């Protein structure tokens, strides 16, 4: 499985364009692609692919809920098929507070004498969902700032 995560702390340098182009190119080559929009600022990858999705609905299940161990449904229900061969996990407004949520989880775990790595939660969620069995390529579109993912 291939994984891409275009990263830069600067905004407007082409991360989303790169992510979308990689997704489309791999899908055209016959690969099954999972694109994950983790852009906290404006969710451009979600807007690029254009699914009907309300990123501001606080009651909808979203990736953040899964990252902090409070899912409201199955992981596969987070995905939206946006083109043949491309499933998208759309951005959600809760991503803006992801660092704080993960820090709270870390502090709570440490209070109980448990270890918790904020920086491994995306890997944990993807592993638990067995994405390797379904997808050939994963592309993560990140925000133009440093963060826990």
Protein language model features and the residues they cover:
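P-loop NTP-binding core
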Residues: 1-149
